[in-house]
Structures are given as C-alpha cells and as structure tokens.
Amino acid sequence: MTHTLTDEDPVPVLDGHNDLPWAVRELCAYDLDAISLVAGEPRVQTDLPRLRAGGVSGQFWSVFVPCSLTGEAAVRATYEQIDFVHRLAATYVADLALCRTAEDVDAAVATGRVASLIGMEGGHSIDSSLDVLRSMHERGARYLTLTHNENVPWADSATDVPVLGGLSELGRDVVREMNRLGMFVDLSHVADGVMRDALDVSGAPVIFSHSSARALTDHPRNVPDDVLAQLPGNGGVCMVSFVSFFLSQRWADWYFEALDVAASRGLDPRRFEDVDPILRERSRLAPPAPTVADAADHVEHVREVAGLAHVGVGGDYDGASYFPAGMEDVSGYPLLFEELRRRGWSSSDLAQLGSGNVLRAMRDMEEAAQ
C-alpha cells in the first residue's frame, strides 16, 4: 500500500468503518449463502465487485452492536459479530485476508486481497471489563470506539446528555490498556470532553474512524477544530465520513428535526431503530443530496487544520442510508479522489489520504504497545 502512484493509478483505500457485518446479521442472520457478495448484492452498499471498483485495498469491518443491548447480551453479540468477520474472510479467502497488524495489511495487499481488520463500535461491547477488552483484542479487534450513541459508565457520548464531562478513571484505564495491547482508541461518537481527555491520556495515535469537520457542519458527531489541531502532536488520523448528516448543514438540520419528532412521540432519539422510520417517513422533506465537492471540502478542512498526515477516509457504508450523489456505496471513492486531484492534490497526497496515513498511525500504535 506504500507504492508510488501515478495520475493513472487507482488510489488504494484503507477505510476506517464499514457496517456490513450488522447489515448481514439483520438481512439474513449471517447466512453467507443467502447473500451475493461475489456476484453483487443490491440489498447492501458493500460487495466484492464494488470494493474492487472503489479501490478498497483494506477495510476496518465494524463489529457494532446497538446500545439497546447491554451487559452480557452486548458482549455476546459482539463476539458473534467478530466471529462473522472471521467467517467472512475464511469464506472469501481468495478476496479477503484477516489482518491484525500493519505488516499483515501490506502482505494481504501484495497478494491482491482486501485486508480485513476488526473495529469495535461502542464501549458497551466490553461491559466495563478490561478482561473482555483483552479477550476481544485476542480475537482480532484493533480498535474500540469508546462510545456509540449513548453514554457508558466511564465515557460520555456525543449524542447523549453529558454525565462525566469526559472520561472517568476507568475510562482512562481503558485507554491505557488499549495502548498497552496495541489497539487504536477511536474517538468517533464520543463527547468533546472525552476527545480531549483521551488525547491527554493516550501514549499512542488515536483515530476518528468515521467523523467529519464540525467547522463545516455543526453536528456533535463531527470533530471541532481545537481537537483536530491536537492530532499532529498525537500522531492520530481523522477519517472523514461520507454520511450526509455530517457533510451538509441542511442535512444535519433535517436530521435534528427528525430527532425532535422522535422525542415528541415518546421514542428515543439516540436509537437508530427509533429514528430511522421517521427519517424514511419524512424523506420527501429531505434536502438535495450532498455532493462529492461537499465531501472534498471536509477532507480539505481536516488537512488545513490537522495537516496532510492526519486525514483519512471512513465512509460508514452499510451504517447509514444517505450519502453524496455518486458516492452511495463503496464504489464511489474514485470520485472523491478525482475531485481532490482537480483541486491540486498530488498522487502522493492522495496515497496518504487513502491509506498511507492510517497505516503509518497503525505502525506507530503497534510500536507503542508493550
């Protein structure tokens, strides 16, 4: 993934976040015979032909479980998600390679396979247990998003009412243990105070696996400039998400209106399963889709504030329904790179954005492990 690109070469992508495992669970209870990932599967945003078309050479597969699952149920469901990623790679062994290290990623790409890594989404998946964290690392997890849409006992979520104002002492211990094990601390979804506390505590690069720039779209899931400005000192990477709510203020406002409707009906605006039907019900009121240029604006803003070495891509495909026109699935990355090339990005710049920066951060994270 580190070879020199020419203007004609596809830009290799190591994407930070894809929710295909949960989509397959919901669609067919993990039955790989019931889904057409080789021929092309229109019911999802990710399949093998479209990964190839998008230049995706590596993917962090999210092993997300919803916050409605707690305690042992959340832990069990996360193990089931991890097991699915193992089975996915074993089933499509000619196309995918399960990876645990940056060296593994390089080896997979050298054989023409998509490097497949595991990312956990939400601290509820470990049930406040460092033992569970260690076990999931042993099973291949290489990042943990500290929260999802709801607070955990040791960290505040960006989309919940703050309780702690940041990380508790257990939360700080979680960050330190992740550093020791060799796992990325993922700060997407967390409250601003958690971002700042984690950057203070972490002795290894952090990532935002799927977040965009708050200066351009005022959404709590996006990253404020003062936090982006800390990434050079930490070595971390903000991997820009392509979800419409994060790229366009008009879309963010439409989303917030749906949250208000959910609350007025006695539903939980933090829960996707409560909000998604309202979004679909109100789809006729949705703004025009964001553009590829909107996605490029966020990438360029992160570059301007944090520096070229600290920006990547984390599409969040199969984790959302709304994306820029032309980038509705994993085949769309080349359109982003074409737009950035038009704006003056060099082939070397694009190689860093697509995969080089997160691989460098991964090597640094591994070196910091004990």
Model-found features: residue ranges?
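N-terminal hydrophobic targeting/anchoring segments and the immediately downstream early-domain regions
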Residues: M1-L167, D218-Q370
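Catalytic beta/alpha-barrel core
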Residues: L96-C99, M183-V190
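Charged catalytic cores and adjacent phosphate/nucleic-acid-binding surfaces used
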Residues: T4, S202-A204, A213-A215
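Short, surface-exposed connector motifs at secondary-structure boundaries
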Residues: V114, V175-M183
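Distinct, well-ordered alpha-helical segments
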Residues: S129-L133, V194-A204
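Histidine-centered catalytic micro-motifs
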Residues: V13-L20, V190, F208-S212
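Active-site glycine-rich loop that binds ribose-phosphate moieties when present
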Residues: G165-R176
